[in-house]
Amino acid sequence: MANEKPQNYANHVRIDPMFHQVIFFLAAIAILLALWIVIRYFGLSSIELLLLSVTLMLLALRLRAYATKLQDRIIRLEERLRLQSLLTGPSRSRIAELTEGQLIALRFAGDAEVPALVDRALAEHLPMDDIKKAVVNWRADNFRV
């Protein structure tokens, strides 16, 4: 990670090559091949192969969704703890009003800009993307799945 370029709004999205380029690609090929076999050699075995291939693709997609959802839950917990230590007064009492997306986006904000950004997010009902765009001192998340 030392040789990675600094993370910012433009490059913060993570692509997992093993999933996005290998597993997904192989599952798609398996479905196409199974479809070809069903058309060419229709029978119970070919239908079973197609069902297995589709199941493999759905399983891969669900596993990815489960991993990111779990990580979102952990990020929400981390950010609530972080906000408890950074915010004071009325802002601190309004932490529960932040949406899941707002909490997840706030993880990229440096400690110094968090209080103002939280106040703005709550006052303007900022969506996740707008919060990320408003971050000046980007705090990288290099461990995102």
State where each predicted segment sits.
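Charged/polar positions within long, soluble alpha-helices
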Residues: 37, 86, 108-111
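Membrane-cytosol interface motif
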Residues: 73-104
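A membrane-cytosol interface segment of integral membrane proteins
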Residues: 106, 127-145
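Short, surface-exposed polybasic-and-hydrophobic patches located at secondary-structure transitions
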Residues: 117-127
